[in-house]
Amino acid sequence: MTTNTVSRKVAWLRVVTLAVAAFIFNTTEFVPVGLLSDIAQSFHMQTAQVGIMLTIYAWVVALMSLPFMLMTSQVERRKLLICLFVVFIASHVLSFLSWSFTVLVISRIGVAFAHAIFWSITASLAIRMAPAGKRAQALSLIATGTALAMVLGLPLGRIVGQYFGWRMTFFAIGIGALITLLCLIKLLPLLPSEHSGSLKSLPLLFRRPALMSIYLLTVVVVTAHYTAYSYIEPFVQNIAGFSANFATALLLLLGGAGIIGSVIFGKLGNQYASALVSTAIALLLVCLALLLPAANSEIHLGVLSIFWGIAMMIIGLGMQVKVLALAPDATDVAMALFSGIFNIGIGAGALVGNQVSLHWSMSMIGYVGAVPAFAALIWSIIIFRRWPVTLEEQTQ
């Protein structure tokens, strides 16, 4: 059975289930950002020391995305999704039971393995299962699941951690994943691998300068963002001096603003993608540079978080759309590379934030993050001038 022979309702249910899966995967990647202080207290460690967990997770995803994608390139996609969800759930049970920080890190590596495969195949699967003529909306739905992870997943995870302990946050994510797995088993048809690409795809992709430029832009701008974002929770409490509840509200506000960014990109992205991305990077630069000055006021931090969230959603959507359009003949390989590169940026940013916090001052994370943000802005202007035709139309 294919999406051409099923009702639109069933087709949309399949896409929605994938969007829920995207929500869960993004929630578990980002939720430690809101739990660093609690985890540190539990294991009698410094918050900055616990933050290295973010870098390890991200770099495992970066390192394994392409190898795992190639290893599973011929595996039927429904079976592959079921297997990776089993690994995902088991790893969260281990997170819940972890009796030391080392065990917690090992459990997170298991989650990262599942993550590495999931994000290399999800976008192309959403396109395949979408109703006829609704591919863009299907991708938008996946993006919405991603955004909601920031809007609801991360703050809810933090709230659960505050009141029931950080272990319950990971356990709850595992339960959500189990329910999603049951839905996937019921709804998804057999999905033979299509257009997954192979090692032969790599030289072809590497010969596409527009695509390589987008990859480079991605890693630099993501590094900038995560230098500050990885430590926003302890920054709000320890540097700004505000309450844990305000830190939760700020994460909710920043994530919610991502929905606004998604709407803006949905309206203007087809015509003005390049201009939107450059503008969003400039906005990110301003937000990072003003992070410490804004720390003297809850209102100032709140307003800054809104613009920060809008900027990052536009940047993330812009990068993903361009990668998919520039590699239609090898979507899984291109997205595996994108996922890996994105996570290199996450890991690098978290590591820079970690080192700044340990050896300088956590108050400086915004200023330090602004440096690669400025470089990303200059690079975006250069590449969008170098390819004046919209990058979506560049196929080689």
Curated annotation (Swiss-Prot):
GO cellular component: plasma membrane
Annotated TM spans: 15-35, 50-70, 81-101, 103-123, 136-156, 170-190, 209-229, 246-266, 275-295, 299-319, 333-353, 364-384
GO molecular function, one term: carbohydrate transmembrane transporter activity
Keywords: Cell inner membrane, Cell membrane, Membrane, Sugar transport, Transmembrane, Transmembrane helix, Transport
Membrane topology field: Multi-pass membrane protein
InterPro entries: MFS, MFS_dom, MFS_Efflux_Transporters, MFS_trans_sf, Sugar_effux_transptr_put
Periplasmic topological domain residue ranges: 36-49, 102, 157-169, 230-245, 296-298, 354-363
GO terms for biological process, alphabetical: transmembrane transport
Major localisation: membrane
One Pfam family named in its UniProt record: MFS_1
Top-level taxonomic group: Bacteria
Location relative to the cell: Cell inner membrane
Xref: HAMAP family: MFS_SotB (MF_00517)
Family: Belongs to the major facilitator superfamily. SotB (TC 2.A.1.2) family.
UniProt function note: Involved in the efflux of sugars. The physiological role may be the reduction of the intracellular concentration of toxic sugars or sugar metabolites. Transports L-arabinose and to a lesser extent IPTG. Seems to contribute to the control of the arabinose regulon.
Record-given protein name: Sugar efflux transporter
Lineage: Bacteria, Pseudomonadati, Pseudomonadota, Gammaproteobacteria, Enterobacterales
